[in-house]
Amino acid sequence: MERTFAMIKPDGVRRGLTPEILARIARKGYRVVGLKQMVIARETAENHYGEHRERPFFGELVDFITGGPVVAIALEGENAIAGWRAMMGATNPANAAPGTIRADFATTTGENVTHGSDSAESAQRELALFFQEGELLA
């Protein structure tokens, strides 16, 4: 079984989308092995988005993700990384396939409701960044 990191971003939490997104996860058969609502510390956000540090939008990205509560989720299941990314849809909601979370709920590329690890390495790093040892179910 594969694990991945998923996040409902501040825009999704603010708009009350958490129950719908969790229901979609359950319908797909993924197991939630960790879940917590939190406000991300600036340092954590900077580490999380470290690959974008030199990009012009980095400051806006960090401000957005730390600007309200998020729901951090550890998912487990068959092909969880690719499967969750398929459920989310393209980063730009205009390019997201119908029926994906971003096509259904995202308003802009910046406020696109969800995040998901893009590789096994990213998943491992992001899970360790957001969950302490003992917080994930075996």
Swiss-Prot record:
Alphabetical UniProt keywords: ATP-binding, Cytoplasm, Kinase, Magnesium, Metal-binding, Nucleotide metabolism, Nucleotide-binding, Phosphoprotein, Transferase
InterPro entries per the UniProt record, alphabetical: NDK-like_dom, NDK-like_dom_sf, Nucleoside_diP_kinase
Catalytic activity, as annotated: a 2'-deoxyribonucleoside 5'-diphosphate + ATP = a 2'-deoxyribonucleoside 5'-triphosphate + ADP; a ribonucleoside 5'-diphosphate + ATP = a ribonucleoside 5'-triphosphate + ADP
PROSITE patterns noted in UniProt: NDPK_LIKE
Pfam entry (one): NDK
Gene Ontology BP terms: CTP biosynthetic process; GTP biosynthetic process; UTP biosynthetic process
Coiled-coil region list: none
Residue intervals passing through the bilayer: none
HAMAP family noted in UniProt: NDP_kinase
Family: Belongs to the NDK family.
Binding partners and assembly: Homotetramer.
UniProt name for this protein: Nucleoside diphosphate kinase
Naturally occurring in which organism (per UniProt): Deinococcus deserti (strain DSM 17065 / CIP 109153 / LMG 22923 / VCD115)
